[in-house]
């Protein structure tokens, strides 16, 4: 019997809420999958669509079922929603351009533009500060509400001439933005080697030097020992509330009397609790901002 040698792609679609985006992107990168895109509708901020293109000869039925079940299980760890999924057979589509066409130039605030690395700068955004990112590297392109809150805060409070520390750097977008908004230097750190690799790649994409933005693999304790006695003027940490609580005892060691904290990854409902927790450690709330049930808080040391 002659077996078919037809080559095609499986296109997988999954509608999901924004708060699990970074977990999904982490999973895709761990699986070595780079041909994916996320489609967002301005009319529905609560749902977005993940699209993944998989070569048929590498992804048999059992592999596709395992792939889908893994994503659904990952979502269930965060919330109970049943996600809508779809598989489609794509024969004539050029996947190398198909997944890329869904990524667009993404304006943030009034000054910043997130630009996928393969796109030309649109004339309409020629006056913006451009941050080039590779969506296929890891951790997305700064589209999560908490990342946008941090970018907007950096724009409101540009770190001119300041030393910045980015704890849990992900793609490196916040450190890159800090440099492009005038920071003297940024030290970024993450416990995930994928994040360190992604940040390193994005540093190169943006023509920055290691002297301007350096990234290392390790814990906040490692960084505190490396930086001492060099203190940061601004400490950025975009992660979950329980993680912030674990890291908070090190914030004093990384900063000085007039430093500022920029903390996000928090739900609006968690702001009061985390603010009270940090107050006990000597930090005072300056401002808070919110978007789509997510929040950012800015703090300074509580001087008697």
Curated annotation (Swiss-Prot):
Q: Name the principal localization, coarsely classed.
A: cytoplasm
Q: Which UniProt keywords apply?
A: Cytoplasm, Methyltransferase, S-adenosyl-L-methionine, Transferase
> EC number(s) of the enzyme?
2.1.1.-
Primary enzyme class? transferase
Please describe what this protein does: Methylates ribosomal protein L11.
InterPro entries associated with the record: Ribosomal_L11_MeTrfase_PrmA, Ribosomal_PrmA_MeTrfase, SAM-dependent_MTases_sf
Q: What is this protein called?
A: Ribosomal protein L11 methyltransferase
Name the domain of life.
Answer: Bacteria
Picking any one GO biological process from the record gives: methylation
* Gene Ontology CC entries for this record: cytoplasm
> Can you name one GO molecular function term for this protein?
protein-lysine N-methyltransferase activity
Family indicated by similarity: Belongs to the methyltransferase superfamily. PrmA family.
Coiled-coil regions listed: none
Catalysed transformations (reactions): L-lysyl-[protein] + 3 S-adenosyl-L-methionine = N(6),N(6),N(6)-trimethyl-L-lysyl-[protein] + 3 S-adenosyl-L-homocysteine + 3 H(+)
Q: Which CDD domains match?
A: AdoMet_MTases
- Where would you find this protein in the cell? Cytoplasm
Under Pfam families, the record lists: PrmA
Q: Where in the sequence is the signal peptide annotated? A: none
Q: Which organism is it from?
A: Prochlorococcus marinus (strain SARG / CCMP1375 / SS120)
């Amino acid at each position: 019997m002659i077996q078919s040698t037809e080559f095609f792609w499986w296109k997988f679609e999954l509608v999901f809420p924004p708060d699990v985006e970074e977990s999904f992107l982490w999973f895709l990168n761990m699986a070595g999958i780079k041909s994916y895109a996320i489609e967002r509708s301005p009319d529905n901020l609560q749902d977005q669509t993940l699209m993944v293109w998989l070569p048929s000869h590498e992804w048999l039925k059992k592999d596709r079922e395992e792939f889908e079940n893994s994503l659904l299980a990952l979502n269930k760890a965060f919330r109970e929603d049943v996600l809508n999924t779809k598989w489609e057979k794509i024969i004539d589509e050029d996947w190398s351009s198909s997944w890329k066409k869904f990524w667009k130039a993404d304006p943030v605030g009034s000054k910043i533009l997130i630009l996928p690395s393969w796109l030309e700068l649109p004339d309409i955004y020629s006056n913006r500060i451009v941050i080039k990112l590779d969506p296929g590297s890891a951790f997305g392109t700064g589209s999560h509400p908490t990342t946008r809150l941090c970018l907007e805060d950096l724009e409101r409070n540009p770190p001119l001439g300041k030393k910045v520390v980015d704890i849990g750097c992900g793609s490196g977008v916040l450190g890159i933005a800090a440099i492009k908004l005038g920071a003297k230097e940024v030290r970024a750190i993450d416990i995930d080697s994928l994040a360190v690799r992604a940040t390193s790649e994005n540093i190169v994409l943006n023509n920055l030097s290691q002297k301007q933005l350096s990234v290392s693999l390790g814990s906040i304790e490692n960084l505190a020992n490396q930086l001492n006695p060099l203190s940061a003027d601004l400490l950025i940490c975009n992660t979950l509330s329980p993680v912030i609580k674990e890291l908070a005892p090190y914030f004093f060691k990384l900063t000085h009397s007039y430093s500022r904290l920029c903390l996000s990854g928090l739900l609006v409902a968690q702001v009061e609790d985390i603010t009270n927790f940090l107050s006990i450690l000597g930090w005072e709330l300056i401002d808070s901002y919110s978007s789509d049930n997510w929040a950012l808080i800015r703090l300074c040391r509580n001087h008697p």
